[in-house]
Amino acid sequence: MKHSYRADEPLWLNYTEAISKTWDIDPTYNAIHGAMKDMGEAKTHRVLAGMALYYHLGFSCQLAEQSTDENFWDVLGNNYEGTKRGTERRYFRGEQGRASLKYIKDNYKTPTDFLLGLHRDKYSDLLKAFGPVPAFGPYFVWKMGDIYDRILGMPIQADNCIEHLPSEPFKGMELVRKEMIARGDASFADYTPQQMFEYMESQTNKLGLIAPPAGDRLLDIREIETAMCGLKHFYTGTDYVGKDLVKHSESLLGYGETADLLRSHMPPVIARDYFMAPASVIKLHGPNRKIDEEGSNPIVKTTGLGSFFR
């Protein structure tokens, strides 16, 4: 089964629908949420604390497996230098990272204390709670909000989110604006960021797209943020629908039984051609790309990045 491009929908909405229906939008949430019952609360919290600091799912599982609540911070510190970091935590090194570990260890005895002690009901209050914690700027507080709301079932009201979004989704948002203007709606030129995100949320809601992993609500600004981060790379040919499913599934290989358990709950990998848009549509975006048109199946080539639309 493939997701067919629908010309009556803008490309950004086709893309968002495709990553939503395949759970490619946030597959790690499905994996952790699905394994929680078997892991138990304490180990789940160790996995999540590891993710908060290193953002590498495989290592976080290994760490949770080889530590206890009592020695977790020490084990984390002892493996500080050589531990893999996820791309999002590539700068969590040197004195900045050590200062963060020290602060957390000094203030929270266990990973459970850390997670539950910093939770707040509103995103604006969550930002304040994490304010004193080194290496937890707006981007990772946003990630923590996802951990609470989507994985732990501890809802967070998304108040004032637009004011604190990381910079990356705004780049995707501007591509949506350009696309909608190109489709003939000049009014998008005057939309504020708030109006843009409200528009995108309303369009995904009309399609009934649900938020992973529990599917307990429709997509909102938090999932739209994720989609916008991916959309920029999709338009420039460095991403494809299903890429995160592959990446995060592979990140669990070779990290022990807990990682294998999470991998068993990862959404299934899909074919690279699950969603393909006509070259004539893609040509509207990413002016630096070379497009080889072959019917409705374009091969988009970006220097040094390979071909992702095929």
UniProtKB/Swiss-Prot annotation:
GO terms for molecular function: transferase activity. Pfam families: ADDT. It comes from the Viruses. One of its GO terms (biological process) is symbiont-mediated evasion of host restriction-modification system. Keywords: Host-virus interaction, Inhibition of host innate immune response by virus, Restriction-modification system evasion by virus, Transferase, Viral immunoevasion. It catalyses: 5-phosphomethyl-dUMP in DNA + putrescine = 5-N(alpha)-putrescinyl-dTMP in DNA + phosphate. Transfers putrescine to 5-phosphomethyl-2'-deoxyuridine (5-PmdU) to produce 5-Nalpha-putrescinylthymidine (Nalpha-PutT) as a step in the pathway leading to thymidine hypermodifications in the viral genome. As a final result of the pathway of hypermodification, Nalpha-PutT substitutes for about 50% of thymidines in the viral DNA. These modifications probably prevent degradation of viral genome by the host restriction-modification antiviral defense system. Mutant am37 contains a normal amount of thymine, no alpha-putrescinylthymine, and hydroxymethyluracil. Mutants am36 and am42 contain more thymine and less a-putrescinylthymine than wild-type. Belongs to the thymidine aminotransferase family. This is Putrescinyltransferase.
